[in-house]
Amino acid sequence: MTNRWKTAVLAAALAVAFGAEATAPKTDLMGYTAGADVISVPVTDGRIDVVSGVVYRQIKSARRVDQLLMTVLQPRTNGLKPAIVYFPGGGFSSADHEKFIEMRMALAKAGFVVAAVQYRVVPTKFPALIEDAKGAVRYLKAHAAEYGIDPERIGVLGDSAGGYVAEMMAATNGEKGWDTGDWLNVSSDIAAAVSFYGISDLTTIGEGLNQDKVHSSPAVTEALLVNGAAFGNFAGAPITADRKKAMAASPLGHLDGTEPPVLLMHGSADTLVSPMQSKHFYDALKAKKTDVSYVLVEGAHHGDDPWFQKPVIDRVVTWFKAKLGGEKPVAGKTADKGANL
């Protein structure tokens, strides 16, 4: 057997071993010309439609109307899907809802409708941001058919200040008095919540950290959120000035055992929001017999690179799948595969 023949036999054997066909290019394909590479692409991923600039809430004042926006990632499938509402972090001073595309796209590819939302920040006081968060959930439930959402399977996800919002959504699930604005005929209750390095107690954000003393200032954002800015005869007040008021604005102040499943994740090296925030919330939820999981990420800081890695993202996707389930088929409905090319 010549070396050339041996090489051909070996190539054919390898092709069979790896499931490939040792065939010549299909020269009869329309568009083929000598030298063209002909490949066959298996379809393993569906398409995701992006709907941006969605106005989910309007805040009217004496001189203007502020519009709060959401961006929706919508898998192009025909069934009823669970949904995730993402609340971005920003230290209570910003809410850039276009962040964390890595996590949002992973969830969308896994079959979730993902809505990333703006919410009001300082100098607007509490409870505005929670009213906005609940308004976003109500909006999605009211428009569930439009986005292919199962309204009974909506979860929330947030990081940092957004984690605080997610925790508040879980802690106040079923509580009355938070819903304002439109779509008041539907519930703002959620079915699951994930918090990344969130805040459960506004009075102890820096617990155990060298920077803890900064939180005694009336100018830190949690103090501005709850007590407001200095103005006129009001000189401002630290977050601990009225502990009852502060706890009414904290997730730990609302637990009653009716919370939905919760996943908490925190970095052990976080120096902005103490890891003790998640520890205390986990312990309190366990004491209430809530379905709660806690993941401490060794060496991770606040919003640094580990949070964007596959093991973290996969853990969240898997957890949401376990708690909310997958897509449910709708009889007689087919997706428009050619829409929005």
Where are the regions a protein language model picked out?
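Primarily recognizes the serine-hydrolase "nucleophile elbow" in alpha/beta-hydrolase
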Residues: G135-Q211
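Short beta-strand/loop motif that positions the catalytic acidic residue
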Residues: T258, L264-H266, D270
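Catalytic nucleophile-loop/oxyanion-hole region of alpha/beta-hydrolase
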Residues: A95-M103, A115-P151, P306-V312
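Mobile cap/lid helix-loop segments that gate and shape the active-site cleft of serine hydrolases
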Residues: V43-G46, G208-H254, A287
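Conserved alpha/beta-hydrolase "acid-adjacent" motif
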Residues: T271-Q277
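Histidine-bearing beta->alpha loop at or near hydrolase active sites
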Residues: V121, V297-D304
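N-terminal cap/lid segment of alpha/beta-hydrolase-fold proteins
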Residues: K26-N78
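Short beta-strand element of the alpha/beta-hydrolase
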Residues: L80-G90
